[in-house]
Swiss-Prot record:
Source organism (scientific name): Synechococcus sp. (strain WH7803)
Cofactor(s) the protein requires to work: K(+)
Residues where (6S)-5-formyl-5,6,7,8-tetrahydrofolate binds: 29, 91, 131, 460
GO cellular component, one term: cytosol
Co-factor binding comment: Binds 1 potassium ion per subunit.
Gene this chain is encoded by: mnmE
The enzyme's E.C. designation: 3.6.-.-
Subunit structure: Homodimer. Heterotetramer of two MnmE and two MnmG subunits.
Gene Ontology MF terms: GTP binding; GTPase activity; metal ion binding
Keywords per UniProt: Cytoplasm, GTP-binding, Hydrolase, Magnesium, Metal-binding, Nucleotide-binding, Potassium, tRNA processing
This protein's name: tRNA modification GTPase MnmE
Residues reported in the UniProt entry to bind Mg(2+): 240, 261
InterPro entries: G_TrmE, GTP-bd, GTP-bd_TrmE_N, GTPase_MnmE, MnmE_dom2, MnmE_helical, P-loop_NTPase, Small_GTP-bd
C-alpha cells in the first residue's frame, strides 16, 4: 500500500445503533493516543481496579465539575497493537437509548485531542495499521448491513479472508508470469526459450477465474442489496392480493372495487435468501379522481426504478388492449414477466399478449397456485438465483476491478495473437496485477481509501 498520512488525533463514536427506547446497552468506542487518558478523565473507577489491557473495569461516567453521575458503565481497555485498529482502543459500555448515550459521548468529545470519528474511520485505521486487509474491512461492513441469512454467510466468508486469499492467489500467478516475461526481456540470450503458448494458457485460466468471480458478484449483489419488484396492472387484477400472499400478511386492502390501492405500498420479504422490496402500485387507468391520479403517477415512477416488473392481468377476462398499453409503458431496460392471475377461474382462450403466446406465469393469488413457479421466475429473471456452491461474492468496487483485470488479460492475449515481442505482453499484464492489488488494498491512495470508507457506518 502506498504511504498515507496518519491522523494522530483520537477519534470517538457510538459503535452501536441508537434509537429511542431500543437497545439495553450501547458502546462508545475511542481509538488513538489519548483514548485511555480521555476515558480516565471522565470516569470514576472505584476500588483497586487496574487499568490493564484487555481487562473490564466497572465505574461511572461523571458530568464535569459537578461530579454528577451520568451513567453506570463498564470500560474495556485494549492497548496497541492488540486492538481492532492497532491503536489504543477504549470502549465504554453504557445504557442504551438516546439521552444517556449522547451525554456520555459529549463528555468524551470534550476531552483534549478527541474528535468525532468519520464514517468508517475505525476500519480505515485498522487497514492502515495492518490489522485488516481491505477486503475483510469491506466484508465487515457487508455483514453489518446484511438483510438475509445468505447475505450474512457470504459476508462472513469475506471476513474470514476468503476474498483476500482468492485474489492474492490469482495475483501471485500473474506475478510469476510477469517475472518470466521480464527475465526474457532483460536476459533472453542467457535463458531457455519461453513457452509462449503455456504462458498464454495460464493467463487465460486466470482470466476465466476472474470472470467467474465477477459473475458470482452479480448474484451476491442481489443478496446484499436486494431487488425492487413492481406489481403493475389494471385495477382489480389482483396486485394487492399477490402482495399479501407473498408477504404472508394483510399489507394491502383487498376489495372487488377497482382503484382500491391509491398509493404506492412497499413490503419487505425474503425469497430464497434474496431480500425483495415488493411495490404494489395503483391500478393504471384513466380517472378523474385527483388522489388516484397521484397514485397512478407514482406507479409510473415505480416502473422506472424497479429491477423487475410483474405485469398482472386477469385470466378470467383475458388479455385486453389496456394490458397491452401497460406493457408498452414498461421501460425497455427493465425486465418484466407477464403474470396471469385468477387461474382458478380462467377463460379458456386467455392469452398473454397480442402475439398469442402464453403468460410467463399462471397463478392464483387467492389460493397460492403457481406461487413457487413465480418465485423461481423472479429470481432467474433478475440473475439472483444462487445455489449453495456460491462461496464468495465480490462487491461492486471489487467486481469492477476484477473485470478491469480480466479485460487487461484479454488485451494481452490479443498482443500475443499479433505476434508482438515479450515486452508488449507486460504492459497489460502489469495493469491486471495493479487492478487486483487495488482489490486487496496493496495498490491504493489516500483519496481512494477515503471514498471507500466514507460509505461505512459511523463507529465502524
Amino acid at each position: 500500500m502506498q504511504e498515507i498520512n496518519r491522523d494522530a488525533q483520537t477519534i470517538a463514536a457510538v459503535a452501536t445503533a441508537v434509537a429511542p427506547g431500543q437497545g439495553g446497552i450501547a458502546v462508545i468506542r475511542l481509538s488513538g493516543p489519548q483514548a485511555q487518558a480521555a476515558v480516565q478523565s471522565v470516569t470514576r473507577i472505584p476500588g483497586q481496579q487496574s487499568w490493564e489491557s484487555h481487562r473490564v473495569l466497572y465505574g461511572h461516567v461523571l458530568a464535569g465539575e459537578s461530579g454528577e453521575r451520568i451513567d453506570e458503565v463498564l470500560v474495556l481497555l485494549m492497548l496497541a497493537p492488540r486492538s481492532f485498529t492497532g491503536e489504543d482502543v477504549v470502549e465504554i459500555h453504557c445504557h442504551g437509548g438516546v439521552i444517556a448515550v449522547q451525554r456520555v459521548l459529549a463528555r468524551v468529545l470534550d476531552q483534549p485531542g478527541v474528535r468525532r470519528a468519520l464514517p468508517g474511520e475505525f476500519s480505515q485505521r485498522a487497514v492502515l495499521n495492518g490489522r485488516l486487509d481491505l477486503t475483510r474491512a469491506e466484508a465487515i461492513s457487508d455483514l453489518v448491513a446484511a438483510r438475509s441469512q445468505r447475505a450474512a454467510e457470504l459476508a462472513m466468508a469475506g471476513v474470514d479472508g476468503g476474498i483476500q486469499k482468492r485474489i492474492t492467489a490469482l495475483r501471485d500467478r500473474l506475478l510469476d508470469q510477469l517475472s518470466e516475461l521480464e527475465a526474457r526481456v532483460d536476459f533472453e540470450e542467457d535463458l531457455p526459450a519461453l513457452d509462449g503458448a503455456a504462458l498464454l494458457e495460464e493467463l487465460q485460466r486466470v482470466r476465466g477465474a476472474l470472470q467467474q468471480l465477477v459473475k458470482d458478484g452479480q448474484v451476491g449483489a442481489a443478496l446484499r442489496q436486494g431487488l425492487r419488484v413492481a406489481l403493475v396492472g389494471r385495477p382489480n387484477v389482483g396486485k394487492s392480493s399477490l402482495l399479501n400472499r407473498l408477504s404472508r400478511r394483510e399489507r394491502a386492502i383487498v376489495t372487488d372495487l377497482p382503484g382500491t390501492t391509491r398509493d404506492l405500498l412497499e413490503s419487505e420479504i425474503v425469497l430464497e435468501g434474496v431480500p425483495i422490496t415488493l411495490l404494489d402500485t395503483a391500478g393504471i387507468r384513466a380517472t378523474s379522481d385527483a388522489v388516484e391520479r397521484l397514485g397512478i403517477a407514482r406507479s409510473h415512477d415505480a416502473l422506472a426504478s424497479a429491477d423487475l416488473v410483474l405485469l398482472l392481468f386477469d385470466l378470467s377476462v383475458g388479455w385486453t388492449p389496456d394490458d397491452e398499453a401497460l406493457r408498452q409503458r414498461i421501460p425497455a431496460a427493465v425486465p418484466h414477466l407477464l403474470v396471469g392471475n385468477k387461474v382458478d377461474v380462467a377463460v379458456s382462450d386467455a392469452r398473454a399478449g397480442t402475439s398469442g403466446s402464453a403468460a410467463d406465469i399462471r397463478l392464483s393469488a387467492s389460493t397460492g397456485a403457481g406461487e413457487a413457479e413465480l418465485v423461481q421466475a423472479v429470481l432467474e429473471r433478475c440473475g439472483a438465483l444462487a445455489d449453495g456452491s456460491l462461496l464468495l461474492s465480490l462487491n461492486q468496487r471489487q467486481g469492477d476491478l476484477a473485470q478491469q483485470a480480466a479485460d487487461a488479460l484479454a488485451r494481452s492475449a490479443q498482443v500475443a495473437a499479433d505476434g508482438l515481442p515479450w515486452d508488449f505482453w507486460t504492459i497489460d499484464l502489469r495493469q491486471a496485477i495493479h487492478s487486483l492489488g487495488e482489490i486487496t488494498g496493496e495498490e491504493l491512495t489516500e483519496s481512494v481509501l477515503d471514498r471507500i470508507f466514507s460509505r461505512f457506518c459511523i463507529g465502524k
